Structures are given as structure tokens and as C-alpha cells.
Amino acid sequence: MNDKRKYLFWLMPAALVLLAVLFFLYPRRVDVILHMPASAADIHDVRFQRIEPDHETLEYVCQGYTLTAEREPELLQEVCDWLYAARLNRPMPGNGGLHDPGVMYILHAQPSDNSEAPTILILEDGRAVVNGVRYRLRQRDMAALHAIYQHLNTIYD
């Protein structure tokens, strides 16, 4: 009987540690973290920016797009589809910033009810910050984000 108690005593903490590790590794949906509405129809606009450093002049080049349902419904739907499909992995506490001299993407989706929505900052290597917590984006989500940016560039340039 004593061995059974000892076994149960050590089984409980081991199960809790395993559960914590699985929760840590479980990917989180971007739309849930950003507190977005249930459907893309409830989004008023999406602000999409790409900030790229110019290493020769030490300045930053910012390209910004504001997509609305009235002007660009297809593009807005494409960005919203990405926001609803993308997954963030491995949350890590951080100081809320990304310190890297590389390319950064900034996405902000504004709901139709004008409620406050967080912004997601994404570096080219897949690191992201939402509400001061660092995450990693999957490679296929980063590839889709690059494709959306290229699509926006071909339309507006």
C-alpha cells in the first residue's frame, strides 16, 4: 500500500508538469490573442505597415496601407483570413519590444464597434509581440504574410 501512495504522490506533479509543457507548446490563434470579432465582416479596417531600415542613410522606410471594406474588400478579406488562420507559438515573457535592425511588420485590426484592439509587431524571422508577450510565428504563416505584402505592393505601386 505504501508503494501505491508513493506512486500516486509522484504521478500528480508529473502530470501537472506535463500539462504545463503541453499548454506552453500549444499554438495560439492570432485572432484570439488580438480579441478580434468572430467574423471578418465585423472589422472596420486593418492597418498594415512594413518598416525597413536603410543601412546606408540610417533611416527607416515605412510603407503603410489602410484597408477598408468600402475600398478594398478583397484585400481586407485576404488580410483577415491570414489573421484568423495564423498561429503563434511559444509565449515568452518580455519587455514588450523587439530590438532588431531588420524589417518589421505592424498589423492592427480595428473592429466595427470601435473597441480597443491590440497591435501585433512581427519581425522578418518570425518573432512577434502582442501585449508585451513574445511569440514565434510558423514559417508558413510568415510566407503567407510576405505574399500578402507583395500583393499589396503590386497593387499600390
Locate each region found by the language model.
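Function-determining sites in protein domains
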Residues: N2-D157
